[in-house]
Design a protein with these regions (language model features):
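Bacterial Sec-dependent N-terminal signal peptides
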Residues: 1-23
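Extracellular and organelle-lumenal recognition/adhesion modules and their flexible linkers in secreted
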Residues: 20-194
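PDZ/PDZ-like peptide-tail recognition elements
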Residues: 194-201, 403-459, 544-551
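Cationic-aromatic interfacial patches
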Residues: 203-205, 220-342
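Cleft-lining beta-strand/loop regions that shape enzyme active-site pockets
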Residues: 208, 216, 232, 257, ...
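PDZ/PDZ-like domain segments forming the peptide/carboxylate-binding groove
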Residues: 217, 222-225, 229, 298-331, ...
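Conserved PDZ fold ligand-binding element
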Residues: 227, 231-235, 364, 460-493, ...
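Amphipathic alpha-helical substructures
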Residues: 237-270, 372-417
Length: 743
């Protein structure tokens, strides 16, 4: 799935787990069981104005199909609606196939398709890279994903419509290893419940209240958080799932909070550790790689004023424990980014109690401590962050405070991949759901109107393209930015300004008072605000998915935009551009499909390295070592012209990875400005209260070992748009690329 906003929104929606009912009627895959004009057993989620109903007139089979249509009066940006059904069982097998018939009418600004998700983060496909557009007759489509029944909690199927138009779905089928799901040959997988799975004692709350926030108490809670996290990822008995480690914290906390002094505190910790079980001696269990890029941070054991016995207990576990599998962790096959398992999200806890808020902080801090490949790149020493945030989390008074606390600590990770992607309901309300009808961005360090989402609102809004906004509701824009900085997690300044620029013109009110400069005249005007669904909003750049991604510019220069590139266009690009003077690849966007190797093969004559990665360790958490990166192979028909790549702050993650690949081409030039500085496959994190975030799960480096995280892809020629260029409608970055090719 390529659309990051769609990834985030899909990850927000949770579904009930496996049930005991397996009858075909309950599955209702043919949509024939209907109540109140809607298929029984299905859920709906998404954003935007859509209607989903049973349709008895247009159908492929039986008496009913399902119709999804965009009912908005205006074209809607970044909206979708999905039909969802959770399969009642977990199944033995190697792969699952979802098939279904789809018919479409005037699908634009998006696509229609099936979708299949295996939770938690085991597999996902929503046909984004091969979605159905336009008007099409009934045709069967399918999705296939590998199964992992041992770790599966839910399997969810469905269909979705992104953007505008109509789609009909009918006659879904699910197969396990080519056998229909209702076949007698299908075997249900019954997962063996471990003690950690069976422990439900604190499902309704921790019953923990923490009132003493003296410096001594905070120091003790910091120590507990570090010991708790160390044991979670190092002790074999915890790793086996023999303990619900969340709830063991709640069992231990009451006596720990009552410890009268450090001696009593340390005795409690030693006894806690000893009661987990014995660990046999191992002479070669913990050998830190000599070439490790990052080594485990264990200095806290020596620097925390611990008793000798407690130090020995921790050091013994570190030296002798061998953990090859962990109930709470695995590394993704083929990619090796961490996958955090069995982390209960406690979605029913709107405002978690003291114990659960402390747990949330401990969980997140330790994940970063042991499995963030970029922990050395934070502005703050991560070792001191835990202590700083203990009073912040425990002093929160409501859900909004809790969300804001997490946004702040996520921000300290300095990763544009990281944000409060799920569960930020009160934060969303605080920022408001009303938006200006125009877009403003930071150009030449000024907040400049760059585009109207809906030109029909220009007359009432008054501001023109190129106008400079200086004040919002009487406050300097610069003052507002400084006050918001801690609530926008990003890797660097470029991505921060990109993200905050949209929300500056967002409010709970129906209008905003603006002071601005227009042709050197200072003006004031109150602009109306609109609901997102009433505007053609977009993030960073516009996409016309129906247009070709490539063209030949004046002067015989090839141009390719990766925003809407399709796999089947790549051979055409190679053939059509073979005699051009140069090629410009525009990655000031997010690639619609993955092109580094298929398109990159056009520009090299031999296997070419362009990247290498660092990976974490299961047996030595906190250690990160280099692994070899892939090579771009030649297709034997190298392009002979010049190659220029365009980047800016909208170039993030896969965009940056792609830019790195093309940068490896001899004499290629990168033109533009600082990219978002967040690359590598993401790892998702569940947090109490229904919150969710992510991190960049692997370290991404150039072959010579230079960092890309936070730094981004550094242009060979630095150029940004100017206010005059914005006013005149010029793409100055593109013009510079043309100049470079012509010279």
């Amino acid at each position: 799935m390529k659309n990051k906003w769609l990834i985030a929104l899909f990850s927000m929606y949770s579904f009930f787990g496996f049930s005991q009912n397996t009858s075909n009627e309950i599955l209702n895959l043919d949509f024939e069981n209907v109540k109140d004009s809607f298929p029984v057993g299905y859920d709906v989620f998404g954003q935007g104005n859509y209607d989903i109903t049973s349709d008895s007139k247009i159908l492929q089979n039986g008496k009913y199909a399902v119709l999804i249509q965009n009912s908005s009066a205006n074209k809607v940006g970044e909206s979708f609606k999905a039909l969802a059904f959770t399969l009642p069982k977990n199944y033995k097998g190697n792969f699952i196939r979802l098939k279904g018939f789809i018919k479409t009418e005037n699908v634009t600004n998006g696509y229609a398709g099936l979708w299949l998700r295996i939770d938690p983060e085991i597999g996902f496909d929503n046909m984004n890279d091969r979605g159905i557009v336009g008007t099409t007759d009934w045709k069967e489509y399918e999705i296939v994903l590998p199964l992992d029944p041992k770790n599966t909690k839910n399997i969810v199927i469905g269909a979705l419509l992104v953007g505008d138009g109509k789609m009909w779905i009918d006659n879904l089928q699910v197969e396990i290893d080519d056998k229909k799901i209702d076949s007698d040959e299908i075997e249900v997988f019954v997962k063996e419940l471990l003690p950690a799975d069976k422990d439900k004692m604190f499902d309704k709350g921790s019953n923990i209240t923490i009132t003493d926030l003296s410096q001594e108490s905070i120091t003790n809670l910091e120590l507990l958080g570090k010991v708790w996290g160390f044991l979670k990822y190092h002790h074999p008995e915890v790793a086996k799932g023999n303990y619900n480690w969340d709830y063991e914290l709640f069992r231990f906390l009451p006596q720990y909070l009552n410890a009268k002094n450090n001696k009593e505190r340390d005795v409690l910790l030693v006894n806690w550790i000893n009661n987990l079980g014995n660990i046999p001696e191992c002479n070669n269990c913990k050998v830190v790689a000599t070439d490790a890029v990052l080594k485990p941070e264990m200095a806290w054991v020596e620097n925390s004023n611990l008793s000798t016995e407690l130090k020995k207990s921790i050091q013994y576990i570190y030296q002798n424990a061998k953990v090859d599998e962990n109930y709470y962790l695995k590394f993704a096959l083929g990619v090796n980014n961490p996958e955090f398992l069995n982390e209960n999200i406690y979605v029913d806890m709107n405002f978690p109690d003291d114990g659960f808020r402390l747990l949330a902080l401990y969980r997140y801090w330790n994940m970063m401590q042991y499995f963030n490949p970029n922990r050395h790149l934070t502005d703050k020493d991560w070792n001191v962050v835990l202590k700083e945030y203990i009073p912040t989390f425990l002093n929160t008074k409501n859900r909004l405070d809790y969300e804001l606390a997490f946004v702040q600590i996520i921000g300290d990770v300095k990763d544009t991949h990281a944000n409060l992607w799920r569960g930020g309901v009160e934060l969303y309300k605080l920022r408001g759901e009303n938006y200006a009808p125009f877009r403003a961005e930071f150009v030449e360090n000024k907040y400049v109107v760059t585009d109207y989402y809906n030109p029909e609102h220009a007359e009432n809004a008054k501001l023109k393209i190129g106008d400079i906004i200086t004040h919002i509701n009487g406050k300097y824009v610069t003052t507002i930015i400084d006050s918001l900085r801690i609530y926008y997690p990003t890797s660097n300044e470029a991505s921060f300004l990109r993200n905050v620029s949209i929300d500056l013109l967002r409010s709970t009110d129906s209008e905003l008072e603006l002071k601005y400069k227009s042709n050197n005249q200072v003006k004031n005007h109150t602009i109306p605000l609109f609901k997102r669904d009433d505007l053609n909003m977009y993030h960073g750049y516009k996409i016309d998915k129906d247009a070709k991604s490539y063209k030949i510019l004046e002067g015989n220069i090839g141009y390719v935009s990766l925003a809407n590139i399709k796999d089947d266009e790549i051979p055409l690009i190679k053939s059509d551009f073979i005699n051009t003077k140069g090629i410009i690849i525009d990655i000031r966007n997010y690639p619609n499909t993955f092109v580094p190797f298929q398109l990159g093969s056009y520009f090299v004559t031999e296997p070419t390295p362009f990247v290498k990665f660092t990976y974490g360790s299961m047996n030595n958490p906190g250690e990160f070592t280099f692994g070899d990166g892939p090579l771009i192979e030649s297709d034997g028909n190298k392009y002979k012209g010049k190659l220029v790549i365009l980047v800016n702050e909208n170039s993030q993650s896969s965009s940056e990875y792609t830019a790195m690949a093309f940068k490896a081409v001899k004499d290629a030039k990168i033109i533009g400005s600082t990219t978002a500085g967040a690359d590598g496959n993401v790892s998702r994190i569940n947090l109490p209260g229904g919150l969710g975030t992510m991190i960049s799960g692997i370290g991404v480096y150039y072959p010579d070992g230079k960092e890309t995280q936070r730094v981004g892809i550094v242009p060979d020629i630095f150029i940004q748009p100017t206010i005059e260029g914005i006013k005149s409608g010029k793409d100055e970055v593109l013009l510079k690329a043309i100049e470079v090719i012509n010279n």
